[in-house]
Each structure stands twice: as structure tokens, then as C-alpha cells.
């Protein structure tokens, strides 16, 4: 999403927050010198709701959803924008996406349950997953889920056995495209746990098997080549490879789901493509090699919510090791943001109390957990961090809450949506008693 253009260039230049691509649109340093998001002072929010806390700009999320829809509407009426809900699987997020006219992608029975609870019409739900259980498939079929994305021969047989009516399906294929991103979020290469390979004829066999089915109605193909992608050319190549496959098996898909994957800015220096450019490449690519009536589906997740959210922490300890490092320890860590440990992900950080001051202390923001690797941000400049400060890491809106865990018996943080200066809790903070709730 483009940054808020309403601010003058001089104001933006003087405000490091407004100038940064990693914060929600409209974020700034307020008159008290503090970080402000969606009109909310982050220090005041931390005092009110406690820390750690996931904090989102609701308008930022809505703005990005509308930008996707607008970008398609300017080019075609044969499209569907599908929220990849694994990025932020909270009922409030599902509800917001439904209100903005998006469909939803769910990858488990739990995500399906939340989508239905948020009011999504079953016909607008797309069920994914490389190992869907019989219970999940039964739930989906009983609910009337619109589209099932088939991922294996075992699943084809399982679905065929459970169904007593027609079910619209897409076959997930792996086009053999390897974009420049982390190995753990590459999904389109031949060696992948997802989908049917095009190069090894598995996809061709899958098409034939589904065509023989009495209940599975093949309406299209799905291909997702990976996540956090800054290059657009791999999408073009993937579409061309899929088109060649369709010609080879005489398939004229009603739907072509070209996945998600658009990267976001995690660092001030990151320059991901704009949503409009991303949509242009996909629409032009599909129109060049497929029938004009083919409906184009995309599945954004990270690019909808990633830069819309930040995480706020409270500093508990500042430990200087002379000649080595200064550790700023906060009251969260790998239980609320696993990505630095899982992917080696890098983040910015700011002292929200002094967001407008020039950072002068080289520090490492460490978590509270019993792991030496529990480091959120390594070797970053902070403005004189002291005990009691609120430290914020931006661009945590995707896969922070989704991957949160109870390591060391730490309750998971709340999710707070902010709009026009008001913050509201949409997921409450867990308590110590919650940790006992499932014990027998």
C-alpha cells in the first residue's frame, strides 16, 4: 500500500516514522514526541492494555483490501481476492475482510471454523491444506464450502469417498519456479510438500483422476510459488508454465488461482512492488495466455496485514557488556514473534516514548525466554533505551499472532485494533489460568 501522501515532503522528512515504509499508513511522531498509529499514542496504549500487545491500524488493513479490489476492477471483472487467513487468523480480521468484499482461504478446520463464525458465506471459502483430515473434509462438505483445493492422490480418494454431491475443486500444481525468498516459504519448486508436480506428470495424473470422479468437479488450477517475493517475473513464468500444461491436458480452466506471495517492507530499505504493479503482472500474464473469460484468483495475506500491525513491548532490563553488546530485554520474544528464530527475519525497532529522537545506542532487543537465540532485533540503533520504555517492532502484523505460543508458560498477547484515536481489544490477553484450562 502506498504511504499516506497527504503529509508535506518537509514534514515527512522531519518525521522518521512517517517516512518509513514499515509502519501503518498515517503513522507519525506526535506532538509529545511519541509513536502514534491510527491516532493512538502507543505509550498510552501500552499503559492501558499492557505489554506485549499486537496493535493494528484497522483503516490500514481496509485500505490495502480496497487497493487490491480497485486494482483488479480497473483491469477486469473476472477476479476474486481471497484473504489468506493464516497471516492473521482472528475473528475480527475475518469479519473485516468479509466486510470489504473479499473471499477467504482457510488451511485447517480451525481456520474454517473461525471464518464461518465471522459470517463468511461457505461459498466464499476456499479450503487448502496438504494433509486435510477426514474430520476437516466432513466439516467442510457439511458446511458447503465453495472450493476444495486438492493436494494429493490420497485426498482425492478421501474426498470422493466422503462426498454424496458435486464439489467444485481446484488442483494445486507446483510449476517448478523457485523465486528469491527464504527456503521455508518457497512452495512452487519441484521438491515441495504441496501440490502435484508438472514436470513429473503427477499433475497430469491428478487431472485424469478427477475427471473420472463422479463427485469432484474440476473448475481450475491453483499455484502458489512462495511468500515474501519482491520479483514479479517469477509470476509471469509460472503462469506461462501452467498455460502450457493446460494445453497439454486439454483443460480450459474456469478459475486460475495464482496464489499470493507479494512481499512487504520489514526494513526501512526494503522496496517491495506496489499492489497495483503486482495485480497488473498477474492480470496481463493470465490474459496473454488464457481465455479472456478465465477468472483470476489471488490470495494475499501478508501484504494485507503485515505492515498494518506492530508489537509493543516494555523494557525490563538494559544490560551493557563492555566492549561486546548492549542487551535491551523486553517482556516478550519468541512466544509472540517466532519469525526471527524460524526464518532469521530482520526487523526495525523504535523507542515509542522518544520516537522522534535520533537513535544513539547500538543495542540488541532480546526476549525474555530461556533461549540464547531468543533475539527479536540484533544490532539496531535505539534512542537511549531505559527500563520502563515501550519498544515497538513494526511490520509484525502477519504471522506474529498466528504463530504465537506458550513457551515458558507465557500467556499470548492481546490483539488491539485502532481507528481514529480509539483502541479496542479484539482478542483478549491470555491469563495464567488459561494455561490450565485444557489440563485434565
Q: Predicted regions span which residues?
A:
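A charged N-terminal "starter" segment
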Residues: 1-148, 153-168, 204, 208-217, ...
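Active-site loop/helix belt of alpha/beta enzymes
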Residues: 2-19, 175-319, 382, 408-410, ...
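Short acidic, glycine/serine/threonine-rich loops at helix termini
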Residues: 94, 117-118, 137-142, 159-163, ...
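Hydrophobic residues within beta-strands of alpha/beta enzymes
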Residues: 104-105, 125, 148, 221, ...
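Flexible loop residues that form catalytic
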Residues: 130, 153, 226, 261, ...
Amino acid at each position: 500500500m502506498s504511504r499516506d501522501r497527504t503529509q508535506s515532503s518537509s514534514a515527512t522528512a522531519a518525521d522518521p516514522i512517517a517516512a518509513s515504509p514499515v509502519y501503518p499508513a498515517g503513522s507519525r511522531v506526535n506532538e509529545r514526541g511519541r509513536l502514534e498509529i491510527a491516532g493512538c499514542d502507543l505509550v498510552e496504549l501500552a499503559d492501558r492494555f499492557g505489554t506485549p500487545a499486537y496493535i493494528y491500524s484497522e483503516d490500514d488493513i481496509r485500505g490495502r483490501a480496497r487497493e487490491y479490489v480497485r486494482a483488479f476492477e480497473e483491469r477486469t471483472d473476472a477476479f476474486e481476492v481471497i484473504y489468506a487467513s493464516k497471516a492473521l487468523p482472528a475473528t475480527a480480521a475475518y469479519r473485516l475482510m468479509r466486510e470489504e468484499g473479499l473471499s477467504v482461504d482457510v488451511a485447517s478446520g480451525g481456520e474454517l471454523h473461525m471464518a464461518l463464525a465471522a459470517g463468511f458465506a461457505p461459498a466464499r471459502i476456499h479450503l487448502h491444506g496438504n494433509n486435510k483430515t477426514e474430520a476437516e473434509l466432513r466439516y467442510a462438505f457439511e458446511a458447503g464450502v465453495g472450493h476444495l483445493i486438492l493436494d494429493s492422490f490420497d485426498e482425492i480418494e478421501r474426498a470422493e469417498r466422503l462426498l454424496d454431491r458435486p464439489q467444485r475443486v481446484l488442483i494445486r500444481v507446483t510449476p517448478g519456479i523457485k523465486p528469491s525468498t527464504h527456503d521455508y516459504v518457497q512452495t512452487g519448486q519441484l521438491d515441495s510438500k504441496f501440490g502435484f508436480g508438472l514436470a513429473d506428470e503427477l499433475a497430469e495424473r491428478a487431472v485424469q483422476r478427477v475427471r473420472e470422479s463422479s463427485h469432484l468437479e474440476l473448475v481450475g488450477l491453483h499455484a502458489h510459488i512462495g511468500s515474501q517475493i519482491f520479483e514479479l517475473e517469477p509470476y509471469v513464468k509460472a503462469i506461462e508454465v501452467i498455460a502450457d500444461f493446460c494445453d497439454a491436458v486439454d483443460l480450459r480452466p474456469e478459475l486460475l488461482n495464482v496464489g499470493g506471495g507479494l512481499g512487504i517492507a520489514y526494513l526501512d530499505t526494503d522496496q517491495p512492488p506496489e499492489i497495483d504493479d503486482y495485480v497488473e503482472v498477474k492480470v496481463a500474464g493470465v490474459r496473454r495466455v488464457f481465455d479472456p473469460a478465465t477468472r483470476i484468483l489471488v490470495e494475499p495475506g501478508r501484504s494485507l496485514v503485515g505492515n498494518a500491525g506492530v508489537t509493543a513491548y516494555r523494557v525490563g532490563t538494559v544490560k551493557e557488556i563492555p566492549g561486546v553488546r548492549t542487551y535491551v530485554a523486553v517482556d516478550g520474544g519468541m512466544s509472540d514473534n517466532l519469525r526471527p528464530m524460524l526464518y532469521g527475519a530482520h526487523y526495525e525497532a523504535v523507542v515509542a516514548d522518544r520516537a522522534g529522537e535520533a537513535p544513539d545506542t547500538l543495542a540488541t532487543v532480546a526476549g525474555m525466554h530461556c533461549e540464547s537465540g531468543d533475539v527479536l532485533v540484533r544490532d539496531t540503533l535505539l534512542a537511549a533505551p531505559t527500563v520502563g520504555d515501550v519498544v515497538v517492532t513494526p511490520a509484525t502484523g502477519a504471522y506474529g499472532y498466528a504463530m504465537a505460543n506458550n513457551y515458558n508458560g507465557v500467556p499470548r498477547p492481546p490483539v488491539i485494533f485502532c481507528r481514529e484515536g480509539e483502541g479496542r481489544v479484539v482478542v483478549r490477553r491470555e491469563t495464567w489460568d488459561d494455561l490450565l484450562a485444557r489440563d485434565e
